């Protein structure tokens, strides 16, 4: 028993892995997301799945979801959206994962609805094996003005894929159906409440992405609220090295932060491909961290590309430095404010950020690309060479994509364990003490409006 979650009741990791491995057919090119919507338990010594559906586990809650979905179906914006909702209801009533895939395909093809939603067992970050998903929902409407930015990015998706530093055999020959928009969240629920993601790219199924594409969203009102809350709270003044970086951040960081999210969601998650026969779950517990690193690295590599100046997405060739500095400061130092003293990093997104920042720091050491500087007894991150830093990020992107494409478990594990997990206790202690003086909460949440 190696898991603290309730997805595997009395079941060991080896038993769970064998149970799902036996279900899989390596020749199946359109596999379902095995185990996504169930708890695996032992009954009379035999492994069995308790499926989350009407009449199954959590039926009372799911019946209420279905009740409201049926009401939504009656006021759907168009026939496409009505079909999406009907298929989702069918999934909740049957628990059938093929039906879930059918729903996901219909959902990804509905590009005309101004009001849209996420609803279902979606992200598997809470499962150490990366298979079982927590429930989440979000209702949103399209921000027409801000969507112009993401449409430029998604309209150039093939160019970005073709020019990435990744080995050609791991690239998509043809990028399909990358749709992107900026949305306003109207209500949050489940695992997206009260603290939500700032960007979402779905569906998670690799074959659906390849055959049908994906939907990417940047949640504009959430990002805007975070940005406004961060201005003037003293955080940057405490942790940023000098006025030069502070001025960069003041001038560009809101824009480059949003662009990095767009690139991460629109292009990063949708880029690359698995080699034939590679199990999508091959990286097991390290899969989520590797996938987030892949998307972040794609975004970081391209936020510095002259193509963004050409597309008029950034005003000049200096803007990206704000994103590089804040990302490294966060990955090397300031995200440690969310970790208790003496603990290591467990959460996938945080592991990914430290992995990227630490790897770049270690591999750029000889050229002093990034350094830790001391001033008045305080530690700061200094970036000495932004161009070399971009080259390093490109090298890491190529390796992370290789690991994902080949399902190279050992390399993925080594990368995460070596760079993404261990916390420097002295630095951690210092960061916590400095942060405490600012009286800022490490996480921010949102209150749902009453409609």
Regions found by a protein language model. Give the residues of each.
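Conserved helix-loop functional segments at active or binding sites
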Residues: 268-276, 304-308
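Short alpha-helix carrying the canonical HExxH Zn2+-binding catalytic motif
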Residues: 254-267
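Short, glycine/acidic-rich hinge or "gate" loops at secondary-structure transitions
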Residues: 79-85, 100, 278-281, 308-324, ...
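An active-site-proximal "capping" alpha-helix that borders the catalytic cofactor pocket
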Residues: 78, 288-305
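Post-HEXXH active-site segment of zinc metalloproteases
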Residues: 272-293
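Contiguous, non-catalytic segments that form substrate-binding/exosite surfaces or channel walls
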Residues: 1-247, 253
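Long, well-structured alpha-helical subdomains associated
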Residues: 300-403
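Extended, compositionally biased alpha-helical segments that mediate assembly or anchoring
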Residues: 382-451
């Amino acid at each position: 028993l190696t898991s603290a979650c309730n997805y595997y009741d009395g079941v060991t990791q080896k038993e769970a892995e064998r149970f799902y491995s036996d279900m899989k057919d390596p020749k199946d090119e359109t596999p379902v997301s095995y185990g996504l919507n169930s708890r695996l338990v032992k009954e009379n010594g035999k492994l069995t799945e308790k499926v989350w559906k009407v009449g199954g586990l959590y039926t009372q809650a799911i019946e209420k979801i279905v009740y409201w979905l049926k009401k939504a179906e009656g006021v759907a914006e168009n026939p496409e959206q009505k079909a999406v909702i009907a298929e989702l209801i069918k999934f909740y009533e049957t628990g059938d994962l093929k039906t879930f895939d059918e729903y996901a395909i219909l959902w990804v093809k509905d590009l005309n609805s101004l009001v849209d939603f996420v609803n279902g067992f979606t992200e598997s970050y809470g499962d150490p094996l990366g298979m079982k998903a927590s429930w989440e929902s979000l209702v949103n409407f399209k921000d027409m003005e801000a969507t112009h930015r993401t449409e430029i990015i998604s309209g150039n998706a093939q160019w970005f894929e073709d020019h990435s530093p990744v080995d050609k055999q791991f690239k998509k020959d043809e990028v399909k159906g990358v749709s992107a928009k900026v949305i306003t969240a109207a209500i949050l629920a489940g695992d997206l409440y009260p603290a939500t993601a700032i960007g979402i790219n779905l569906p998670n199924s690799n074959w659906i992405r390849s055959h049908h594409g994906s939907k990417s969203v940047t949640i504009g009102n959430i990002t805007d609220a975070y940005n406004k809350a961060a201005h003037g709270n003293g955080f940057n003044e405490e942790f940023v090295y000098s006025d030069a970086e502070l001025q960069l951040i003041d001038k560009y960081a809101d824009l480059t932060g949003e662009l990095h999210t767009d690139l991460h969601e629109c292009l990063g998650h949708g880029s690359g491909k698995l080699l034939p026969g590679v199990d999508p779950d091959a990286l097991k517990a390290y899969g989520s961290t590797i996938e987030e690193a892949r998307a972040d690295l794609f975004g970081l590599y391209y936020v510095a590309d002259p193509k963004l100046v050409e597309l008029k997405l950034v005003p000049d060739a200096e803007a990206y430095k704000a994103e590089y500095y804040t990302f490294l400061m966060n990955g090397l130092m300031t995200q440690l404010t969310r970790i208790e003293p003496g603990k290591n990093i467990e959460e996938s997104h945080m592991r990914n950020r430290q992995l990227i920042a630490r790897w770049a720091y270690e591999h750029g050491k000889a050229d002093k690309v990034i350094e830790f500087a001391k001033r008045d007894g305080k530690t700061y991150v200094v970036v000495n060479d932004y161009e070399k830093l971009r080259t390093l990020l490109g090298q890491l992107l190529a390796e992370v994509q290789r690991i994902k494409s080949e399902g190279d478990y050992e390399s993925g594990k080594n990368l995460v364990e070596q760079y993404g997990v261990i916390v420097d206790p002295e630095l951690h202690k210092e960061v916590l003490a400095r942060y405490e003086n600012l009286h800022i909460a490490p996480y921010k949440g949102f209150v749902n409006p009453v409609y």
